[in-house]
Amino acid sequence: MSEQQRVAIVTGAAGGIGRELVLGLLGKGLKVAAVDRTAQGLAEVAQAVQQRQQGANLMTIEADLTRDESIDEIVSKARGRFGMIDILVNNAGVGQATVRSDNRQHPIKFWEVSPEQWKLFVAVHTSAPMALSRALVPDMMHQKWGRIVNVTTSLGTMIREGSPTYGPSKAALEAFSAIMAKDLTGTGVTVNVLVPGGVTNTGMVPLEAGYDRAEMIQPAVMTPPLNWLVSDAAGGVTGRRFLAVHWDPSLPPEEAAAKAGAPVAWTEIATMPIEPPRRG
């Protein structure tokens, strides 16, 4: 199968990073099912794609990832339009501003988080990626080709004061990514993590945060590394995490990957637990 025949599902596709990922994959010639809960945002993405004369390769799916039923609906609709799903990009995110918009000035304490807020972050950042991956991986393994890219976050954000929901739920996805990569070793299905590498100019960072938007990382930095990670050329790359801001598009992709990459979950700096030998 040529790369142009492949199909990707991208969650959180209506704006910010997700929008750039969708446009980048379409620009590469892939077919994309763009998933988001925001109908207006999806319509704007579709309009931008039509202006680029790539509308035939895009479908939009309005779905709420906190609903268990949404997983089957997304997969069914995407397969109904495009057939086999080859690529999954778990990008959907919920920002700390949904808990409180002045979080940067007055960091949220963990005891201020309601059970409903906690469940929302875990559902979107951890449970939905697991459920979508579980639904799609059997077919990927059957065809001996698949790509899963999980958008987590930087270590500093995982443990930052004021991030008691966003950080832990993204950290769980990071750990899950490492396990996924090990489970899928030798199957032709790769699992990698891609993050911007810092505070990024998206709607998840409210104006109240006080940043100069022009000085923030721009979402478009995610496109070059993603396009390479979902290619045939990256078939031997799995269990890695990449900081898009350190990806140098002027270098050959393999060199850029070496510069911007590290093991998922920072296992190279971890002291692993002592495990005694097993009998038998």
PLM region spans:
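Conserved glycine-rich Rossmann-like NAD(P)H-binding loop of the short-chain dehydrogenase/reductase
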Residues: 28-44
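The beta1-alpha1 cofactor-binding region of Rossmann-like NAD(H)/NADP(H)-dependent oxidoreductases
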Residues: 39-40, 62-73, 115
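Active-site helix of classical SDR
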Residues: 133, 169
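Alpha-helical segment proximal to the catalytic Tyr-Lys
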Residues: 138, 182-183
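C-terminal helical subdomain
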Residues: 186, 193-194, 211-280
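Catalytic Tyr-X3-Lys loop
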Residues: 94, 106-130, 145, 149, ...
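Canonical Rossmann dinucleotide-binding motif of NAD(H)/NADP(H)-dependent dehydrogenases/reductases
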Residues: 2-33
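A glycine-rich helix->loop->beta "capping" turn
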Residues: 3-4, 52-57, 77-90, 96-97, ...
